[in-house]
Amino acid sequence: MKKQSFFYLLSLFMTVSFAFTSCKEPVTPEPPDPPLPPDTSEVVIPKTEWEKADSAYTRYDYTVPSHTALKIAITACASDPSEANLETLRLRISELKPKTEPYCMVANINGDPKTRMAFNWFTNDSVFEGEVQIIPVENATVEDFEGNNGVITIRADYERTRKLRYAGKARYIVNAAGISAADRYNYIAHKALAENLTPGTAYSWRCGYDGHWSPIGHFRTEDANQGEYTFVVMSDSHIENPTFIKEARRCAKAVVKTVPEARFCCFPGDFVEDGDASNSEWEWERWFEESMEPVIKAMPMVVTDGNHDDSPNINYTYHFNTNNDFNQNYTSAPQFQGIVYGFVYGDVLFYVFSMQDFWRETHSYLDWTSTYLTDHIGSWFRDQTMANPGTQWRVSLAHFNLFSGSDHSTDKEPPVFRHCMLPVFKENEIDVALQGHDHTYEVIGPVDPDSLTPILSAISDREEVGGGNNKNMTGYKGGTYCTDDGTFYFIGATCGYKRYYPHSRERMEREYTDDINLLQDDKHHNVKNYFDLFTGMFGQPEKPCFTAITVKEDCLEFNSYLADDDQGNASLLNTMRIVRTKNHSIPTMMQ
């Protein structure tokens, strides 16, 4: 009985428990844990070819120019990874130059060109070593230098250039290379001066230091008794983007191919487009490394500054090595060093000067005065003439115009320049004034410095070819111009892409005011019958232009050429002769 009761109670308990459990809500099973993410610590996302290049090659290990070229290629690939762009990228990698190598090299006439030559170049900020090697071998090779056969070595001085704005306002390079407009780079500027060279000798030169050399350049010292020779003048390259770079390089290649015998190249300013505080060192770099590279390797440069070259960074001073006596010896020194200097080559006295600093000391647009020009530049002209009174020819080189016939003719500065400099030109009997700034081909004068009229009796042999248009507003070509009683003014258009166009007679008459005492403004040029001053070819040739000037026994022969293509071919634009029948006199203030 007890045993049955136990099993009965156990059965009853299990029945009740089952019933109770059956009445509860069904239990939803817990979801399984989500799978763990894959372990990515060892996974490397493949980089593109240009991304690898961007991280592998840094600016601090290579020269600034070669690394910027790589940055342009990287940016192009990131936008369009075509095979052509990738090939360019690989080429730029192969062209990278170690940071120790020099760039922006140039030779400058500095002092007596029979026995002296000056040199200038840049390196990255960390390179303080520098020297020039010169060898009396024409078209020398690296082997000639390595053979140490008469190599002259000159140690260079250096100056650290701090925080030069690299891109600045040059929008092309900002976009093309992904460089900030505010980026500033440091460089070392190296300067060396060779003295006691042998007159009439062809030299080759290179700069840098042991194992880190520039390409080889060439020059020839003036002969001891220099006879006939040729020099070149061109200006206003205004480097700012590839189109401007290419046009100026066309001109430089044409110079070297057309007149390989040229002794030097005159360049009166506006090397670059962007001046002021937002200027671009990249533009200067491209002028040296690309645009003018053919000429720079072939001959020394004779330079002075233009208004687009001015900047607080004084890039101009860092890049050239010209005579600085004016800054050291005259009361009012200009901003840049070496923009006012003279030299004699053969039978020509060259006055290289700048009117850019005319505003220093007392000046007035109202009465057209500048004590800087009249007192300091004027005194310097007299000193140059006094030191070299016997040359047959006197030629000035400056950027700004005393006379011009395009967009700058109505600026407010030319009346100041005329009022201050015409008496100086008259006193020193300047034969030829080589000018820039106006970007048009302009033959002016000879101009009587007192009446401001052309001396028509001094002109002969002009050819009438039809004009009245932008190609040739006057319709004249060629001609012989005698400078006995007035100066011949010349603007050789532009070696680059930035072009202005000639003003017509009608426009010049509208721009004239018959009250020359009025304040000069942007509408008036203040010279009556101004168009008559344009006595020869006057127009826009629409191609890069340079002029070869040959100093002959009886004349200065001008041959102007247009650069036709990228191979250095050129076509003749115009030929003129400058003659003189009187001997030069000593300025009256010196007698």
Q: Positions of the model-derived regions?
A:
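C-terminal motif of bacterial Sec signal peptides marking the signal peptidase cleavage site
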Residues: 19-22
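Divalent metal-dependent phosphoesterase catalytic cores across multiple superfamilies
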Residues: 97-305, 310-337, 382-386, 412-428, ...
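Bacterial N-terminal signal peptides that target proteins for export
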Residues: 1-10
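Metal-dependent phosphoesterase/phosphodiesterase active-site architecture
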Residues: 94-131, 136-146, 150-165, 170-171, ...
